[in-house]
Amino acid sequence: MRLLAFAVLALFAVTQAEEGARLLASKSLLNRYAVEGRDLTLQYNIYNVGSSAALDVELSDDSFPPEDFGIVSGMLNVKWDRIAPASNVSHTVVLRPLKAGYFNFTSATVTYLAQEDGPVVIGFTSAPGQGGILAQREFDRRFSPHFLDWAAFGVMTLPSIGVPLLLWYSSKRKYDTPKTKKN
């Protein structure tokens, strides 16, 4: 009986300790390939899985230096007054990589108040990890339709196909002419 009472008391203490807001945050790249000089779309998702609203939520991502990335639209530092329990918010930023090479996409920082008079809670988003930013020339070489290359290939193969065809056609015309009947 004492063990059962202790278990109920411990369970009650755990549920009381978990009151308040609890945020889960993710950061993801929406592009399949990151290319120098082309738009790179980042999406931040923040989920409140707690029992109360998260207050003064601030998302801050300092992992994109201005000398390597230009901001096309959106902001890397965003603030929400509150995020209701069992709800989520999404934020999208469009960046333009200015240099090619490998880049470490690290996590962003999320700070919030779990309860109105509680301490500031600091959390981090998921980190996409290291990724390569392709040079524009390399991307075009790999993924362009190569119309000029195919046209050059066609012009170069034309003599090897056309000359035998012309020889065959001239001999066919020479020997296949029907003889006219004399009346």
UniProtKB/Swiss-Prot annotation:
Disulfide pairings: none
Record protein name field: Translocon-associated protein subunit beta
A single cellular component GO annotation: endoplasmic reticulum membrane
Localisation: Endoplasmic reticulum membrane
Record keywords, A-Z: Endoplasmic reticulum, Glycoprotein, Membrane, Signal, Transmembrane, Transmembrane helix
Keyword Transmembrane helix (UniProt): yes
Signal sequence coordinates: 1-17
Regions that span the bilayer: 147-167
UniProt keyword Lipid biosynthesis present: no
Membrane topology (UniProt): Single-pass type I membrane protein
Spans within the Lumenal topological domain: 18-146
Record family assignment: Belongs to the TRAP-beta family.
Pfam family membership, one: TRAP_beta
Reported function: TRAP proteins are part of a complex whose function is to bind calcium to the ER membrane and thereby regulate the retention of ER resident proteins.
Stretches assigned to the Cytoplasmic side: 168-183
Subunit structure: Heterotetramer of TRAP-alpha, TRAP-beta, TRAP-delta and TRAP-gamma. Interacts with STING1.
Annotated glycosylation sites: N88
Superkingdom in the source lineage: Eukaryota
